Amino acid sequence: MTAQEDLTAGGAELWRQISGKFLVQPHSCGTAAAVFLGLTHVMSEDPEAMVVVYPPDYFIYPGARFAKNLNDATKIARELEQWVVLLGVHAERLETEHGWIQPGATLGWTDGSHLRRIEALLNRSDVKSRRTALASGCVCNTSILAASAASLWAAARDNFPEMLHLFQDYQASIGSDNQQATLRAAYEKMPVLSLSTDILQSILDQVMVMELSHVVWSDWRNPEWVVDGLRVIGRRTALPQRIC
């Protein structure tokens, strides 16, 4: 999933080599629209499907341990059909590029990972609240989640019908000659919404946080973060010294 303005010639060639369905948004309209474009195709093919959502630019190590965490989250979301399992990770410093999760009451444990209700989802721009949350044991919002496709669809239907109606119109056009034209028309009217602070916030009593355990999580959107992530796992970097 990407937006048209982010798609380079090299990137397009890379995605063509990867199996699966590669979707391009006409333009960026926030994280909710990006997720729901993919979700629309899932709902068309299998309305009872389980879905996992995660950004493509994260480094998580070791991969096998993360896969186990993600598998556990998916099992929980399958058993508790109306619940969304959002993954959080303990932060060692005051992050400014990510949102935060204020955990609430304990719901249980799974293989060493704490499952808790969520008291609040904090926007990354809310610095004062972030400082308070960090001191009180908040976790960084990875934006990685497991849920049934139907539960996310219902959240938008009940709380953001304008957005969902646009995707329903697009859903009806999938496979037809006017599919791309319908998508472009939908995005001309698409509201800019956040998956976390809009969609998930609207169903917060159905969202739990599962704290990632025994993994290193790092955002690799810039070279400095790549270097930091490699250093944590004891790997040398070939990046220029001026970046390191």
What positions do the PLM features span?
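Conserved N-terminal catalytic core of the sugar/cofactor nucleotidyltransferase
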Residues: 1-53, 58-67, 71, 89
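A conserved hydrophobic position in a structured secondary element of the catalytic/binding core
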Residues: 2, 54, 122-125, 147, ...
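Structural motif
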Residues: 21, 50-52, 83-86, 143-144, ...
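A short acidic, often aromatic-flanked loop/helix-cap motif at beta-alpha or helix-coil junctions
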Residues: 28-33, 93-95, 126-128, 215-217
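Residue-level signal for inorganic ion chemistry
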Residues: 38, 57, 101, 148, ...
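A polyampholytic, Gly/Pro-enriched intrinsically disordered region
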Residues: 41-52, 106-112, 231-234
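Conserved core of the sugar-phosphate nucleotidyltransferase
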Residues: 63-185, 207
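Left-handed beta-helix
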Residues: 147-244
